[in-house]
Curated annotation (Swiss-Prot):
Reactions it catalyzes: L-serine(in) = L-serine(out)
Originating gene: Sfxn3
Annotated protein name in UniProt: Sideroflexin-3
Known function: Mitochondrial serine transporter that mediates transport of serine into mitochondria, an important step of the one-carbon metabolism pathway. Mitochondrial serine is converted to glycine and formate, which then exits to the cytosol where it is used to generate the charged folates that serve as one-carbon donors.
GO cellular component, one term: mitochondrial inner membrane
Annotated organism of origin: Rattus norvegicus (Rat)
Bilayer topology annotation: Multi-pass membrane protein
Alphabetical keyword list: Acetylation, Amino-acid transport, Membrane, Mitochondrion, One-carbon metabolism, Transmembrane, Transmembrane helix, Transport
This protein's record includes keyword Ribosomal protein: no
Similarity comment: Belongs to the sideroflexin family.
GO molecular function: L-serine transmembrane transporter activity; monoatomic ion transmembrane transporter activity; transmembrane transporter activity; tricarboxylate secondary active transmembrane transporter activity
UniProt-annotated location(s): Mitochondrion membrane
Pfam families: SFXNs
Length: 321
């Protein structure tokens, strides 16, 4: 037995999730791209530390910081419900490098229709992999649901991009640079509700403050999905709004006119810089364990809760990612 006590709750994040700062610190750790560089041996070592600690066995000499580091490495690579290792590009730590590359290319190759359609398709394919890799173990995504969401989101993104591209032909060049963002925003509004359509049909679990399940609510599901859509669009705003303005200015300068090949890597770099901060900060906009007032729930569920526990005014639910 080591010196580390067994009362550290590694089932929950390390930092206070009721504050924005605590949530931001949590997601900066979860989305850390450096976790992608860890070897299979290092991942297995972290898994052993976490599983042993949960079983009451402490690795000799283990410190609290090392335990939390192992917990976040474990969470970054293994599915929380199934325990399976998540495919590399489906991990949360892959969000920044993958989105940096895809978004940078969407913003660089937006002028020609074939390349614009190609990169919108690549983006939605990546989103499908992420959504499937991080699917809920309690409410798994079926292949049919995944396929419907994938086709619908890709169609919506491409249709939005093509429609706006034709509308912006006679507008200033800067306006045309924002077409990819509009397409991504439209796709998120289609993709996320479709991926979580089962929740919109049967609801998501709502609990009291102690975590005791009180029932299922479609209203809570709608609120959670709305929060996720806002967060996803918010993540895209800095990366898809700031670089176009900067690049529109730089491309008029002699430096880039003489070196046009620098445009793509420069754009990807700018997008990456924005995403390093935007991804964790927008994930932290809303608490993972969100709340909703009992009076806003469906009449049947509201009556059930008020009959069983009349003192409860607020219930809680997991909003998802």
């Amino acid at each position: 037995m080591g010196d580390l006590p067994l009362n550290i709750n590694i089932q929950e994040p390390r930092w206070d999730q009721s504050t924005f700062l605590g949530r931001a610190r949590h997601f900066f750790t979860v989305t850390d791209p450096r976790n992608l560089l860890l070897s299979g041996k290092q991942l297995e070592a972290s898994r052993n530390i976490v599983q042993n600690y949960r079983a009451g066995v402490v690795t000799p000499g283990l410190t609290e910081d090392q335990l939390w580091r192992a917990k976040y490495v474990y969470d970054s690579a293994f599915h929380p419900d199934t325990g399976e290792k998540v495919v590399l590009i489906g991990r949360m730590s892959a969000q920044v490098p993958m989105n940096m590359t895809i978004t940078g290319c969407m913003l660089t190759f937006y002028r020609k229709t074939p390349t614009m359609v190609f990169w919108q398709w690549v983006n939605q394919s990546f989103n499908a992999i992420v959504n499937y890799s991080n699917r809920s173990g309690d409410a798994p995504i079926t292949v049919q649901q995944l396929g419907t969401a994938y086709v619908s989101a890709t169609t919506g993104a491409v249709a939005t991009a093509l429609g706006l591209k034709s509308l912006t032909k006679h507008l200033p060049p800067l306006v045309g640079r924002f077409v990819p963002f509009a397409a991504v925003a439209a796709a998120n509004c289609i993709n996320i509700p479709l991926m979580r359509q089962r929740e919109l049909q049967v609801g998501i679990p709502v609990t009291d403050e102690a975590g005791q399940r009180l029932g299922h609510s479609v209203t809570a599901a709608k609120q959670g999905i709305f929060q996720v859509v806002v967060s996803r669009i918010g993540m895209a705003i800095p990366a898809m709004a700031i670089p176009p303005v900067i690049m529109n200015t730089l491309e008029k300068k002699d430096f880039l006119k003489r070196r046009p090949w620098l445009g793509a890597p420069l754009q990807v770099g700018l997008v990456g810089f924005c995403l390093v901060f935007a991804t964790p900060l927008c994930c932290a906009l809303f608490p993972q364990r969100s709340s909703i007032h009992v009076t806003r729930l469906e009449p049947e569920l509201r009556a059930q809760i008020q009959a069983q526990k009349p003192s409860i005014d607020v219930v809680y639910y997991n909003k998802g990612l």
